[in-house]
Design a protein with these regions (language model features):
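Cytosolic catalytic domains that perform sulfur/thiol-centered chemistry
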Residues: 1-274
Length: 274
């Protein structure tokens, strides 16, 4: 069984063949210190790990998306760029920017499967020379069907045609680890930690393994799927896994628990130990 959308992932061999393409924009999502120590030649450092939104009402959401558009432009991304994103493994940092770009209407985006570790382990060139890009002309064309807001989640609660996926850790899901004003879970959410998407070496699991894993939890392609975590990083990884499988209706909840758990007017449940 193969992925429904295999083009979303690039192998290190594919990247090696295209790394000098003039239209390629390679974005290193790791912390700046990791980038400065060693990175793939021509990669541009783009650490946005600390940038999140905990209020997805229309006005703050619009301002946040405008900021993200300008940050992406600043890394030299053009409307016709072929973008490849990576972190140490095929992880949540690269997944989140992948989701942003798809949401912004940019289809030419890929995740480096296995990440920087796979590139280095293959013996391919690495460098410490920083890439300083010129600004790009990237313009967002948001696809509303790729994002979920707090109002969307509220509207979809307990609908049999929608499944909310909690991609956080066991402790966060049960409320033992509280990273907001309130701990717990969105009522009815199905818990499946994002790390289950990966094998032991940091590559995405096979299509057959992913399909079985999600089907066993009744997360199926006929449903609208809304993943969330704390800040839409880990849930973006779930988004990518489901996109690889060809799920047609997946929407990442941008505010995630950082929004839901900090409000006092939203329903919360406290699941038992998984």
């Amino acid at each position: 069984m193969t992925y429904a959308n295999p083009h979303l992932l690039w192998s290190v061999d594919e990247l090696k063949d295209h790394v000098q393409d003039p239209n390629l924009v390679l974005l290193d999502m790791r912390p700046p210190e990791a980038y400065s120590n060693e990175h793939i030649p021509s990669a541009r450092s783009f650490d946005i790990f600390g940038i999140s939104l905990i209020d997805t009402r229309p006005e703050p959401l619009e301002a946040f998306l405008w900021m993200m558009e300008h940050l992406i432009q600043g890394k030299g991304v053009n409307s016709d760029s072929n973008v490849v994103v990576y972190d140490d493994i095929a992880g949540m940092r690269s997944a989140r920017l992948f989701w942003f770009l798809e949401f912004f209407g940019h289809d030419a985006v890929h995740i480096l499967n296995g990440g920087f570790n796979a590139w280095r382990d293959a013996g391919f060139p690495i460098t410490q020379q920083a890439m300083v890009p010129k600004g790009g002309n990237f313009k967002m064309k948001p696809r509303r069907e790729r994002i979920a807001t707090v109002d969307d989640v509220l509207e979809k609660l307990h609908r049999p045609s929608t499944v909310i996926v909690d991609a956080r850790s066991d402790a966060e899901y049960t409320g033992q680890l509280v990273r907001a004003k309130h701990g717990g879970a969105i009522p009815g959410a199905v818990h499946l930690e994002w790390t289950n998407n990966l094998d032991s070496k940091g590559f995405f699991k096979s299509a057959a393994e992913l399909k079985q894993m999600y089907a066993e939890r009744d997360i199926t392609p006929d449903k609208e799927v809304i993943p969330h975590c704390q800040g839409a990083y880990r849930s973006a990884h779930t988004y990518v896994a489901l996109r690889l499988l060809g799920y047609p209706n997946v929407r990442n909840y941008l505010g995630s628990w950082g929004e839901w758990g900090n409000r006092g007017d939203l329903p919360i449940e406290h699941p038992s130990e998984p």
